[in-house]
Amino acid sequence: STADAGSFLTDQMGEKDLEGFTLRILSTTENKDGGFAFGTSQFIPDENEPGVVSDAIMERNNLIEQTFNCKIDVQFTAAYEAFVQKVTNDYIAGDIDYDVIASGISSNGLSALAASGYLEDLNAIENSYLRLDQPWWDQQAVNGLSIDNKLFFINGDLLLTDDERTCMLFFNRDLIEENQLEDPYALVEAGTWTVDKLYEMARAAAVDGGDGKMDVEGGEDTWGLIGAAFDTYKMVLGCNAPMISKDENDMPVITMLDEHNVAAFNKVYDMMSDKDHVAYLENYYRWDDWTNGEKFYNQFYEGRALFYANLIGSLNKQSMQNSSVRFGVLPLPKYEESQSGYACTIDPYAFTCIALPKTGAGNLDKVTFMLEAMAYYNSEKVVDLYYETTLKLKRLNADDNKAEEMLDIIFSNRIIDLANIYNWENCIQYYNQLLVNNSGVVSFLEARKDALQNAIDQTVELFRKLQ
């Protein structure tokens, strides 16, 4: 019965009558073939994407609404700049008619709204029901996204499109066998999956189709690794080398010029700039040339690339669904074997978090209660379904008994770099620029360090003034 099912929630949350309160969520809409298949159904059932995950969300909402006498309402708006502009306009007009916003956390998403002072500090809400130290909230994000102990957005089991925007590598299992290469899964488990090993295997698998040159047009060449220029940054993060770290006072500290970070960039640069074995999109086409971009990435789906740097959400793309390639999933490689663990960064543009806009409505206790209930429910009832149906059984091969273990490693080793979130001085493009013209990483970064520090200081000062 509903009452029996509701006891599962009340055992955790306690009895509460929310007196018909409606939780109003504003979320962004995305292109589902771009890896955003759950942008709708993580909040409400999606009529266009039926399945067990959508059904579980419907059951969650019904149970919470009946158990606590409340309602869940979701409205959708365009993403990125349009989303930021809508919230900004509504805030200035005093016309915010939603309690929760959900979007990516980049500088054209939630971090822009935080830097404008429009969001509640989740660590400072009186009578909050959010238990952010619990495992259904992403602890890497709780610790990584704050500045000066102020936390403006968060993710966890409440959301699905955060996991989908986590960076990793696909690999072609058939090419591994054909080239008699080491099993990447065994390397990951042994802690020996490194950039050097990735590069070694990429060189071994790359094959010229017979015309004496490697290119992406003829359809005959096989590449060791394909990706985009921005994968340089992601791989450096995989070496546990963030551009910006935090000190003991939770303050941002520039670390991009640390010896380890410079060495990590140089190692990744040597691989990414090897045009005989590695192909990145921008070396052939513009980053926003979607037609040729699709053709470029089809090299992996057609079996002509050993490794493919992308995001978990690519599993939902039609090209991946239709591919006959037997593929596996891997975390980003370490800098060296002695690195303590793997590190997988995020795509901030659509790595979804939730935030609470400042409304002055005085209902944050009810808002946080419902969010906590939804997150807890998902941790118990939805996350496993998402894993099994979407990430594993939906597309990963039935004979791949290591994929779910790899997903656990990827998701439990997310690394948050504040440079990736706030993009002060367009710093996340630094490595892309060096990939095109490497005049020396140290001198390049030194010339930009002061301006970067000044931009960081301005954000910190703004946050300190917020009440």
Residue ranges: model-predicted function:
Residues 124-135, 216, 242-263, 337-344:
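Short, solvent-exposed loop/beta-turn-alpha elements that line the ligand-binding surface or hinge
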Residues 24-26, 95-101, 147-169, 177, ...:
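Extracytoplasmic/periplasmic solute-binding protein
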Residues 199-202, 244-289:
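Glycine-centered hinge/linker elements that transmit conformational signals in sensory
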Residues 6-21, 34-36, 78-81, 108-167, ...:
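Hinge/lid segment of periplasmic solute-binding proteins
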Residues 98-103, 301, 305-310:
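Paired acidic/hydrophobic, glycine-rich loop segments that form the ligand-binding mouth/hinge
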Residues 320-391:
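Extracytoplasmic/periplasmic substrate-recognition and gating elements
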Residues 358-368, 378-467:
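Conserved C-terminal helix/tail region of periplasmic/extracytoplasmic solute-binding proteins
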Residues 1-115, 439, 445-467:
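Conserved N-terminal structural module of periplasmic/extracytoplasmic solute-binding proteins
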